[in-house]
A protein has these predicted regions:
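Aromatic-residue-lined binding/catalytic grooves and analogous aromatic/hydrophobic interfacial grooves
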Residues: 1-179
């Protein structure tokens, strides 16, 4: 058994997969005034879309996830200029031992470490606006970015850890550079 323990190494690197963050996109639209709401998933392109009308404006949300790039892209657009306005923020779900959540210009960066095994996790949300303006503040106590009067906006969400499938401790490089 001692030989097996030597081969296995320190087992503190093990942990079950877990969700790290919620991405919130909040607007001031009254849901009771939304019409023609349609959700769609194109299996050929892996593009999920939401289309709806609100107070005479047609809105489109497009979602795409890329496993090789470890990103999710969200595009929000409208058929009239200057109609995209919302707040966005990240919420930490793991409540680990090294939590930080900051906003700098167009990017929110959230870091933490799992309390059970010290796995480092980082998520970044970049907001790319076409027209309108960006400002920073807080939403529910979390750093937030507010988009006002944009023609369209693309959100790029990336998340990574220092997990590495390699004995003995299953740890690799800090995730910051990769994210």
């Amino acid at each position: 058994m001692d030989e097996l323990n030597k081969l296995m190494g320190d087992l503190t690197g093990y942990e079950a997969p877990t969700d790290y963050a919620n991405l919130y996109i909040s607007n001031a639209q009254d849901p009771s005034k939304v019409s023609n709401y349609v959700r769609d998933l194109d299996m050929r392109t892996a593009l999920a879309t939401v289309n709806y009308d609100y107070e005479g404006v047609h809105y489109t949300r497009e979602y795409f996830n890329s496993y090789p790039d470890n990103i999710m892209a969200v595009r929000l657009s409208a058929d009239q200029a200057g109609k995209i306005s919302f707040d966005t923020n990240l919420e930490n779900l793991i409540n680990g031992t090294a939590y930080t959540n900051t906003v700098d210009g167009d990017t929110i960066t959230m870091r933490d470490a799992l309390s059970t095994n010290g796995l480092n996790v980082e998520a970044q949300l970049k907001v790319i606006n076409e027209g309108g303006s960006l400002s920073t503040g807080t939403n529910g106590g979390n750093p937030a970015i507010t988009v006002s009067g944009a023609d369209a906006v693309t959100l790029i969400f990336a998340c990574g850890t220092d997990y590495k499938m390699e004995l003995p401790n299953f740890r690799g490089e800090d995730p910051h550079k990769a994210v």
